[in-house]
UniProtKB/Swiss-Prot annotation:
Protein name listed in UniProt: tRNA-specific 2-thiouridylase MnmA
Disulfide cross-links: C107-C204
Organism: Hydrogenovibrio crunogenus (strain DSM 25203 / XCL-2)
GO molecular function: ATP binding; tRNA binding; tRNA-uridine 2-sulfurtransferase activity
Family membership: Belongs to the MnmA/TRMU family.
Catalytic-site annotation from UniProt: C107, C204
Role noted for this protein: Catalyzes the 2-thiolation of uridine at the wobble position (U34) of tRNA, leading to the formation of s(2)U34.
Region feature Interaction with tRNA, mapped onto this chain: 154-156, 316-317
Residue segments, region Interaction with target base in tRNA: 102-104
Record keywords: ATP-binding, Cytoplasm, Disulfide bond, Nucleotide-binding, RNA-binding, Transferase, tRNA processing, tRNA-binding
GO annotations of cellular component type: cytoplasm
EC number: 2.8.1.13
Length: 379
């Protein structure tokens, strides 16, 4: 994808380089388009450099090689203080409260498109760019819209729903128009060291480590009982924080423990008794709900979509979008009704709304219900 150089030489773009193929190709494309490109490597986590697990040093090594190859200057900045205060402490507090947070969404909101953006502006940047699979469109009035990436399998708009107009107006997502195999092809053609580098998986600061081992360093585990809906003890857990709703693996309960022989799923948590409630079968009512409540709303346009408008939403990243409507919005809390019941709606996770290709924004789930009357009873 060799692009003819436009007269972009007076426009400085600082690219957040992670050491992966996506951000590498982001820098490559902008360089080909004639922008004044600089790279910035963010260190968001302290404590790994002396451990056996040390991805940051390897990533920085790859970033240095990319910058040398593309002949662009590199800034290395430590945002670990901001990350700890704005992302990680919230992550721990949510787990202590029995919820399941999504720190990658908060990292985008508080670090990549806040701390990094602000710092880039002090370095004279006109824009920042990242290797996200999403797109930004602008209308004649300067209003920005967040669109899904063209690669449906890689679309990351779900993780970017918190971005506001100012952040979008200063951001670029050059690979949002491309599909992942082509991104790798471009990297290989340009002889970039990252062309065959494995995609990172899992929560950014945990990486390939075992989640349980990592969390134990910060939160004391409180073992307890796993009970069925009758309150009968059917197993034991090592800590509620290790279980997310709808989880099947790791319960240690044989499928034949109950009468049905169906597999067991974690369905609810009782923080007062430190009990995990498990049910049999993925179609159990405790696992499936048509209503949810959510707060901490972020709308790309700056305001909530029209109530009872036909929308689509998803309650987890890999879920296909589901038809729904927002029934009410009051004091920063919304009530959402789906056309069909959704499995394992999880407090702490985000519900993100779409209208066609456009991501409208989202909110953090606070509860899941079978009816409006059930919501009113809970108030």
């Amino acid at each position: 994808m060799q692009t003819s150089k436009q007269d972009n030489s007076n426009i400085k773009v600082i690219v957040g380089l992670s050491g992966g193929v996506d951000s590498s190709v982001t820098a490559l494309l902008l360089k080909q388009q004639g922008y004044d490109v600089e790279g910035l490597f963010m260190k968001n986590w302290e404590g790994d450099d002396t451990e056996d697990y040390c991805p940051a040093a390897e990533d920085l090594k790859d970033v240095l090689a990319i910058c040398e190859k593309l002949d662009i200057p590199l800034h290395v900045e430590n945002f670990s203080g901001e990350y700890w205060d704005r992302v990680f402490e919230h992550f721990l507090a949510e787990y202590q409260s029995g919820r399941t947070p999504n720190p990658d969404i908060l990292c985008n909101k508080e670090v990549k498109f806040k701390a990094f953006l602000e710092h880039a502006m002090t370095l004279g940047a006109d824009y920042i760019a990242t290797g996200h699979y999403a797109r930004i469109s602008r209308d004649e009035n300067g209003q920005c819209y967040l669109l899904k990436g063209l690669d449906n399998n890689k679309d990351q708009s779900y993780f970017l729903y918190t971005l506001q107009q100012h952040q979008l107006s200063k951001s670029m997502f050059p690979i949002g128009e491309l599909e992942k195999p082509y991104v790798r092809q471009l990297a290989e053609e340009a002889d970039l060291i990252t062309h065959d580098k494995k995609d990172s998986t899992g929560i950014c600061f945990i990486g390939e480590r075992k989640f349980k081992d990592f969390l134990q360093q910060f939160l004391p585990a409180q073992p307890g009982d796993i009970v069925n809906t009758e309150g009968e003890v059917i197993g034991h857990h090592e800590g509620l924080m290790y279980h997310t709703l709808g989880q099947r693996k790791g319960l240690g309960i044989g499928g034949g423990f109950g009468d049905s022989g169906l597999p067991w799923f974690s369905a609810d948590k009782n923080l007062e008794t430190n009990q995990l409630i498990a049910v049999q079968g993925s179609d159990h009512p405790l696992l499936n709900h048509a209503f949810l409540t959510a707060d901490t709303c972020d709308w790309v346009s700056g305001h909530c979509p029209a109530l009872k408008q036909a929308l689509k939403a998803k309650v987890r990243y890999r879920q296909p979008e589901q038809p729904c409507q927002i029934l009410s919005e009051k004091n920063g809390e919304i009530i959402v009704q789906f056309d069909e019941e959704q499995t394992a709606i999880t407090p702490g996770q985000s519900v993100v709304f779409y209208e066609g290709e456009t991501c409208l924004g989202g909110a953090i789930i606070t509860g899941r219900y079978h009816s409006l009357s059930e919501i009113n009873e809970d108030k």
